[in-house]
Amino acid sequence: MGSAGLIEIKRRIKSVESTRKITNAMGLVATSKLRKTRKELFINKKFFEETEKIIEKLASTISQDDDSIYFKSNKSKYKLYILVSSDTGLCGSYNNTVVSYLDSLVRDEKENIKVITVGSKGLSYVKRIGLDTIADYVDIPDIPTVKEVKIVFESALKMYKDGEVSEINVAYLDFVSPVKQEPKAEKLLPIEKITSVPEEFITEPNSEEVLNNALNIHLKGKFRNILLSAKCSEQSSRMTAMNGATQNANDILDNLNLKYNRIRQQIITQEISEIVGGAEAQK
């Protein structure tokens, strides 16, 4: 391999260096987004925990009878799963992991499962496991707001109120740490009966109405918590994938540079040998 080989290797080196710049930049962006989303998740968890305390106190003042839509199930044979996926790719096995987990949950009852996807990537993945979606929500921001939460949750709640589904569940990748994310499913409705020590206090207009309003706010807070956790997992997966790609690019560059220097050394050695040989022939 001569100078033509060196030109080809230099071209490949430039190509890999260009790719490395992109993956490194994407890794840095994912790291920054993860930091911001984790901060928002921490704040929302505090809100979620406080509403939970309020609900426990309110629940102690009334009888959680079968008239409440939040505690009462219905006779529908269908269960609803909200699948939280990503809108963009380059996040490793993030989408495949959560969809495979959903598949394992519903494998024996797929004919009774309805799915709402959050994130454009979930739609194609869900079809691969033989499920159809009834609604798809895309372009969810990196930090989901109350607006997005309300749209998705109220759509699911309407199906539950109308008796179309007997359960509302959410399948997502729960954020444990930057190096650990676990697939998880949480049931939003119906809520299990709340047991707490009775307390005496006055509520206006009445305890039932206040509790129902509080439960609605609480469930939206819980759903936002899930979306934020899933977004953290997505950014963490993307950060890991991009860091891995950058390291692979570094390894390839090391090999290419070594190969380039070896060939260059061979060419120089050959040229020196030819010069020496020519000089010897002149004697």
Swiss-Prot record:
It is a peripheral membrane protein. It is found in: Cell membrane. Keywords: ATP synthesis, Cell membrane, CF(1), Hydrogen ion transport, Ion transport, Membrane, Transport. GO terms for biological process: proton motive force-driven plasma membrane ATP synthesis. GO terms for cellular component: plasma membrane; proton-transporting ATP synthase complex. GO terms for molecular function: ATP binding; proton-transporting ATP synthase activity, rotational mechanism. Produces ATP from ADP in the presence of a proton gradient across the membrane. The gamma chain is believed to be important in regulating ATPase activity and the flow of protons through the CF(0) complex. Belongs to the ATPase gamma chain family. F-type ATPases have 2 components, CF(1) - the catalytic core - and CF(0) - the membrane proton channel. CF(1) has five subunits: alpha(3), beta(3), gamma(1), delta(1), epsilon(1). CF(0) has three main subunits: a, b and c. This is ATP synthase gamma chain. It comes from Clostridium botulinum (strain Eklund 17B / Type B). The gene is atpG.
